A protein has these predicted regions:
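C-terminal motif of bacterial Sec signal peptides marking the signal peptidase cleavage site
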Residues: 16-19
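Bacterial N-terminal signal peptides that target proteins for export
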Residues: 1-9
Length: 311
């Protein structure tokens, strides 16, 4: 009897607990609305990323040491863009790269594990009113004013609570194809002002050397503490293009490839240099072999055994 009574009491507690949770507990599943962000936002006053950057061009172009490098958004304007970054491997920290058809911008957020709520391919609506637009190393960025180590006020990270009120998830699983930045020794045609922050791919390149004498064959230094390691590429000018790797990246102590590779990543601007930031090791693949006869009429593959015949 005591055992029966015990089970009856447990069942009653479970029913009471479930009723206390109320309808709101099940609401996301019932309404289909996203469990993160602000679902009250509506798609009104939407402008492109290019228009936003044009509107705040002077602040984006100003070094914080030379003047004010950010400004508050006072208008009720929004952008609609797709997440192209991921912090899943630890190489990207507390920021999102957002991209639309006109360009890209970085959002600085004081939150780890952003890939959980906002994985690659998530389309978001971002309400910009009361946030700030400025730059970090001339890279366009959305954030809030923050005092840096030197005591200067620059654009910094939005708190998690504030950020949660400023975005709405519109859809997931969207595909963003990387645009070719360059191939081999060819110079890029990308523009630092308009293309900074975009998802790109550099093809047929190889790792040359790092800026850390202790790091000779790994991506970064996992025991080096806060900081990063920059690798130059044999085929590109190291003053213009580097591969950025955080010491906190999960792949920091992995060996860099020795052969030719294609590298996908977020191509961020840092002053007058391009920083390629990979999201995980999946962004680096052996270089695709270029077929010089691709697209030409005729038969054959151009080898001695099977010469090209265009007759």
């Amino acid at each position: 009897i005591m055992k029966k009574l015990k089970y009856l009491m447990m069942a009653a507690v479970c029913v009471l607990f479930a009723s206390c949770m109320g309808d709101s507990y099940a609401e996301p599943a019932e309404t289909g609305s996203a469990p993160y962000g602000n679902n009250e936002l509506t798609e009104t006053n939407v402008i492109s990323i290019a228009q936003l950057k044009s509107k705040f061009a002077n602040y984006i172009a100003t070094d914080y040491r030379d003047g004010v490098s950010y400004a508050k958004v006072t208008d009720d304007i929004k952008i609609k863009a797709i997440v192209t970054s991921s912090d899943v491997a630890g190489n990207i920290y507390q920021e999102l790269a957002l991209q639309d058809a006109t360009g890209a911008i970085i959002v600085s957020v004081a939150q780890g594990g952003l890939h959980g709520a906002l994985p690659i391919g998530t389309e978001v609506l971002v309400s910009l009113k009361d946030l700030y637009v400025g730059n970090y190393g001339k890279q366009a960025q959305i954030g809030v004013p923050s005092v840096n180590a030197a005591g200067a006020t620059t654009i910094g990270r939005i708190s998690r609570a504030v950020w949660d009120q400023h975005y709405k998830i519109l859809s997931t699983g969207n595909k963003v194809e990387p645009t070719e930045f360059a191939s081999g020794t060819n110079a890029t045609t990308w523009n630092l002002d308009t293309d900074g922050g975009k998802l790109g791919v550099i093809r047929n390149v190889s790792f040359k050397s790092s800026n850390n004498s202790k790091v000779t064959d790994t991506f970064a230094d996992a025991n080096g503490g806060a900081g990063s390691v920059s690798w130059t590429l044999n085929e590109q000018d190291g003053k213009k293009v580097i591969v950025y790797n955080s010491n906190f990246a999960k792949f920091a102590n992995n060996k860099v490839p020795t052969g030719k590779v294609d590298i996908v990543g977020i191509f961020k601007r840092f002053n007058n240099q391009w920083e390629i930031v990979i999201r995980s090791l999946d962004d680096i693949k052996p270089a695709e072999k270029v077929d010089p006869f691709k697209g030409l009429p005729g038969k054959g593959d151009g080898t001695q055994a099977n010469p090209l015949d265009i007759t």
